[in-house]
Swiss-Prot record:
Entry's Gene Ontology BP terms: regulation of translational termination
GO MF term list: GTP binding; GTPase activity; guanosine tetraphosphate binding; translation release factor activity, codon nonspecific; translation release factor activity, codon specific
InterPro entries for the chain: EF-G-like_DII, EFG_III/V, G_TR_CS, P-loop_NTPase, PrfC, RF3_C, RF3_dom_3_sf, RF3_GTP-bd
tr-type G domain location: 9-277
Protein's UniProt name: Peptide chain release factor 3
Pfam families on file: EF-G_D2, GTP_EFTU, RF3_C
Cell location: Cytoplasm
Binding-site positions, GTP: 18-25, 86-90, 140-143
Cellular component terms (Gene Ontology): cytosol
Organism of provenance: Pseudomonas putida (strain ATCC 47054 / DSM 6125 / CFBP 8728 / NCIMB 11950 / KT2440)
Keywords linked to the UniProt accession: Cytoplasm, GTP-binding, Nucleotide-binding, Protein biosynthesis
Length: 527
């Protein structure tokens, strides 16, 4: 095995998906603790606690206690290199989250044991299903009251349409929580409260049919054995092939706050989740062990460092090896550049990187030339597929409080649009600026970031736009005719693309009927 193949085999790149408050931030910290990346996990006790979670670093996230921006953390574990991508936990952030999920090879689903499957989880699982992403499941908060575990598994299967195979099974919950039993290994992992902040080796009791196990379970023993027989009779067994194809999820139980069960999940990612896989480009499939470097940008993030007014483009490496100072071709611009200062991430700690391999995420300094979906290679003209823009569902007109700051407003919105935080439209017939979003919170985020980072205060006004469609047509003459007739509702988006802003659903249906040669598209691939 070559050094490059060995490095690729060590990589595991995954994201955590969950509903807000299911414990994603806490489990992120505990995973980093497993990888010795942070010495003490700063707990996220209350939303106002001073020690903010390491991965939630933007001002508004600190205030709201939700991870709005996708950060990337890399840490070593069991001779593997783990790349963990944090996804926005708020229900609004489907675009950003979707694109993050295009950059991973597997995902960890965190469920609140008291609540089960929640709406946000369903939406994220739909996205994972589009690419058959393998899913590992963690049922969290066993140190509180939870629903019947068998009921939770049934719900996963019925609602998320995926087979659930329990690997561990909880012994009690809340004050009676005594640990978990490993179904195939026939051993008990004992839970002792009070070790949430440090790495500790949990006590293991070999064999359920032992005096030690009887003593540990006490009067819960008989009912637990009965429940296990039921579970083993009714549940699916783990099957590696079904897991890799996204048809079955191994399920683990624990408490992230108590730092219990998190290592079982990380072991599953190392043992079962796929190493970096081949990536489909328009031209061909690119294999991770190919010698030549390729990668695509899935996210752009402004102002990660308040000290530097910068933007970072997050790139997933698909093949080859990044070496400091290497030459790359920026395919869309057909331009060669030398990259000497790529970053690797430990949340908002950044380090300059000497080398990186397929599966790794690196950060490139971006001065406005890199866009989401851009491909970088060592010369080959490739374009990776499947990194879309969605048509926004909500629209607002932007009103500037200080008219003298219109230049800063445009510049700020242009940058936020490039980053994917919002979509911006400039109508052909007016000087208005219209923002589009997939969820209401995005408007708040944009207003607060314009104020914090660009010193521009704005307000929003309602506007009669039902949806946006990207316009294209093979017949140039027809397109010109359409542009003349539909001028009132046409706009140019932040990327310079012609867009139709439909005032109502009926209007859009009529236009599509009237102009059969014009393509009205609800998504646009990043090219």
């Amino acid at each position: 095995m070559t050094n490059q193949a060995a490095e690729v085999a060590k990589r595991r790149t995954f994201a955590i998906i969950s509903h807000p408050d299911a414990g994603k931030t806490t489990i992120t910290e505990k995973l980093l603790l497993m990888g010795k990346a942070i010495a003490v996990a700063g707990t996220v006790k209350s939303r106002k606690s001073d020690r903010h979670a390491t991965s939630d670093w933007m001002e508004m996230e600190k205030q709201r206690g939700i991870s709005i921006t996708t950060s990337v953390m890399q840490f070593p574990y069991r001779e593997h290199m783990i790349n963990l991508l944090d996804t926005p936990g708020h229900e609004d952030f489907s675009e950003d989250t979707y694109r993050t999920l295009t950059a991973v090879d597997s995902a960890l689903m965190v469920l609140d044991g008291g609540k089960g499957v929640e709406p946000r989880t369903i939406a994220l699982m739909d996205v994972c299903r589009l690419r058959d992403t393998p899913i590992v499941s963690f049922i969290n908060k066993l140190d509180r009251d939870i629903r019947d575990p068998i009921e939770l598994l049934d719900e996963i299967e019925a609602v998320l349409k995926i087979k659930a195979a329990p690997i561990t099974w909880p012994i009690g919950c809340y004050r009676d929580f005594k640990g978990v039993y490993h179904l195939t290994g026939d051993y008990i992992v004992v839970y002792t409260p009070g070790h949430g902040h440090e790495r500790t080796e949990a006590k293991i009791i070999q064999k359920l049919d032992s005096d030690e196990a009887r003593a540990h379970l006490g009067d819960q023993y008989d009912s637990f054995v009965e429940q296990l027989e039921l579970v083993q009779g009714a549940c699916h067994e783990f099957n590696q092939e079904e897991f890799i194809n996204g048809q079955l999820t191994p399920v683990f139980f624990g408490t992230a706050l108590g730092n219990f069960g998190v290592d079982h999940v990380l072991d599953a990612v190392v043992d079962w989740a796929p190493r970096p896989l081949g990536r489909v480009a328009h031209e061909r499939t690119v294999e991770p062990v190919e010698e030549k470097f390729t990668g695509f940008v899935f996210k752009i993030q402004a102002n990660m460092d308040p000290k530097h007014r910068d933007r970072i483009a997050f790139m997933r490496i698909c093949s080859g090896k990044y070496e400091k100072g290497m030459k790359m071709r920026h395919v869309r611009l057909n331009k060669d550049l030398r990259i000497g200062d790529a970053l690797t991430f430990f949340s908002s700690e950044r380090e300059q990187l000497e080398e990186a391999f397929a599966g790794d995420i690196i950060g490139l300094h971006n001065h406005g030339t890199i866009q989401i979906g851009d491909t970088f290679t060592e010369g080959e003209a490739l374009g990776f597929t499947g990194i879309p823009h969605f048509a926004p569902e909500l629209f607002r007109r932007v009103r500037l409080k200080d008219p003298l700051k219109s230049k800063q407003l445009r510049q700020g919105l242009q940058q936020l649009a490039e980053e994917g935080a919002t979509q911006v439209f400039f109508p052909e017939r007016s000087n208005d600026i219209i923002l589009g979003a997939v969820g209401v919170l995005q408007f708040d985020v944009v207003a607060s970031r314009l104020k914090e980072e660009y010193k521009v205060e704005c307000a929003y006004e309602p506007i009669t736009v039902w949806s946006a469609r990207w316009i294209s047509c093979d017949d140039k003459k027809k397109l010109e005719e359409f542009q003349t007739k539909a001028m009132e509702n046409l706009a140019i988006d932040g990327g310079g693309h012609l867009t139709y802003l439909a005032p109502t659903r009926v209007n859009l249906a009529l236009m599509e009927e009237r102009w059969p040669d014009i393509k009205f598209r609800a998504t646009r691939e990043h090219h």
